[in-house]
Amino acid sequence: MFVLRPLIVGLTLNLYAPANHAADIPVAPAPGAVAKALAAAAPGDTLRLVPGTYAETVTINKPVTLLGGPGVVLDPSVPFKPDWKPAADIGPGVFRAAVKQRPRTLFLNGKIVAEVDFREAGESGDWGWKTLLAKGPPRAGFKFIPAIWGYHAGQKAVYLRAPDAKDPATLALTQVTDNVAVVSFRDVDGAALRGVTIAHGFAGVSVGEGARRCVVADCAIGPWDRTGVSISAGASENVVERNRVTRGALEDWAPGDGSKERYEIWQLHKSVGHSDRIGVQLFRAGRANVVRHNHVHETFDGVNVGDYTVESLDKPLPRPDDGRETAIHDNLIERTRDSGIEIGGGAIDVHVYGNVLRQTHGGLRFKVPRVGPVYIHHNVLDGGAPFNVWFSMDDAPARGYVYHNTIVGGTAGVQYSSFVKPHNIGTPNWHFVNNLVVTKNGFFGNRKVEAPVNFAADYNVVVGGGKPYPKDAAKDAHSKYVEKVELEKDLRPSPTGPAIDSGIDLSTYLDGKPLPGCPKGYFKGAAPDAGAFEVK
């Protein structure tokens, strides 16, 4: 099974140089089989996993391909069968079990059980861990979050309230005990992971320090606890494509009706849990990473690029080049409990286009992008629940262009909301042109933010009002605010409606040069159509 092919160069034995003919090596399920095959592989080899479950986590640190197919699963979880005892002092239906090793993630019937961080929650109050285990969140109880668990470090014990207060000893519980990804790329140029199901990990795939030109493609990634795919530590020129990424929570993570009761799902994880769970995260990533043609659903955030430690203009930006030249395109991102796509940090030369965001709570969210330029175009935002394009946390001084997008549903097309401490800068370098906006509150809404409305907006077609400059007729002079726009099922506007030929030619918008995606001759009629589609 394992092939060692040394190259003789003069009198030197080189164990790591690629052979003239890379090997195609079959690997069958066995304890540690993938790790052993990786250790023995030569650069350029393909490790072809035969169908079955591989119960391990692995690190790829050679330029090899790990190739799966239908029925190939990497799943490091193991049964969790401690000695459960009723914890009557906490509440009916709550059980306790002493453990030698802390579970990092707990699964019930293969789905992730919501975890409370006892350190964050404290013991008392409606959101104290004892109250949550006994009664659930204060408004909905266990209606939307059917099970809750947590680890007590002082007692070295796990507490669990299972669905319907069942005895955990009768349930199919599994765990992972390591806080690592199922597959990690480290110190490697040109490795690939293709066609593998990544299931029941603390994290799915980590593309980290020293990883360059690696590929994660055609994989089913989930369930996972913290992050589906992460690109971090300066990893550059990597591609994440054609994957299905979903967290696999026991509770329903679709945005739902926006009620305060359902909002408690977000509160439990963000306030007393372990914060965001992100489908694809680029955190302090390097240059020119690409995220494309993926289906990301039922996560908190879909795809993020930025750095949560610099989400205020009061904080310095020590690494403005993080995430430079990131491309996020042609993804389907839907039913997210929080943002569909988030952009922050330096955001230099970031391109977001061709994506469909459907029923996302946070839509396309800007978290203090500082520099730019950011190009956001030809996206479809459908059914925002409630946000679409959303400036949050603080003013956004970056230069940005938002054009040829179709926005349907939700409250307003563009909003200021949730500024923690605005700095009276606003968004002076942002341009909104040639967009089609069909929403309840029209183009712009401001949710109690004291920041100047100073972006440029023009040549948009809008249903619902919401003019950004109602007292200045000279601004936004060419936009059309109309009563109705007929849309096809795919949200293309009617060929006889007001969106047709309503835009401005963007092939010369940048000092005579085109905006990305708008080369000379890119439209069919007398002028471009507003929105993501060129109809007529």
Regions found by a protein language model. Give the residues of each.
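Repetitive beta-strand solenoid architecture
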Residues: 43, 48, 54, 60, ...
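Predominantly extracellular beta-rich ligand-binding scaffolds that present long acidic/polar faces
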Residues: 56-57, 61-65, 351-368, 372-492, ...
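Extracellular beta-strand/beta-solenoid scaffold signature
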Residues: 83-94, 176-183, 200-203, 223-232, ...
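Surface-exposed loop/turn motifs in large extracellular/passenger domains
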Residues: 183-192, 210-215, 231-241, 277-290, ...
